[in-house]
Regions:
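Short, low-order "capping/linker" segments at domain edges
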Residues: 82-94
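Long, low-complexity, Ser/Thr/Gly/Pro-rich intrinsically disordered segments that act as flexible linkers
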Residues: 76-77
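Basic, often amphipathic N-terminal segments
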Residues: 1-69, 91-149
């Protein structure tokens, strides 16, 4: 499985990392910090036998993709184990999703995950993962206290 992900400017990254760290500290679940998972937003997940199969599509995408503005407005849960922050699904993100899918979707011997197809993708940045039911409640409380749309 190969993932295509967005990474953020330094200011956004610091803020998202603070949320991740606070959840780890308050819940005792250190999956994100122990595995050094940086704040990121996965745009696509592609099954392929090798990276070489994807190289032409990646090279094509590199010339067409650009930076954009994202506004994070809410928190959420992917039950039963994940806490996240989510942006507005604006034109930039919608177009990005479509462009990546168009580049990867028809490659021979590959498959784009159903969760990352246009109009079925839920853009989010994971703040906590592998959380128990109790840890989810604590993580939700943490984000209720510290999260402000930005």
């Amino acid at each position: 499985m190969y993932l295509i992900s967005l990474y953020f400017d330094e200011k956004t990254n610091r803020l998202l990392q603070r949320y991740i760290d606070k959840i780890a500290q308050q819940t005792g679940n250190t999956f994100m910090t122990e595995h050094q998972v940086p704040p990121h937003m996965t745009v696509s997940a592609v099954e392929a036998r090798s990276a070489e199969q994807l190289r032409p599509a990646f090279e094509d995408l590199c010339g067409r993709l650009s930076q954009g503005r994202i506004r994070f407005v809410s928190i959420g849960q992917l039950l039963p184990y994940v806490m996240y922050v989510t942006p507005v699904l604006n034109e930039y993100l919608q177009e990005l999703s479509r462009s990546v899918y168009d580049a990867m979707g028809d490659l021979p011997e590959t498959r784009v995950s159903n969760y990352y197809r246009p109009f079925s993708w839920l853009p989010h940045v994971t703040m906590g993962k592998t959380l128990s039911k109790e840890q989810m409640a604590v993580a939700f409380g943490v984000l209720q206290e510290v999260f402000v749309p930005f």
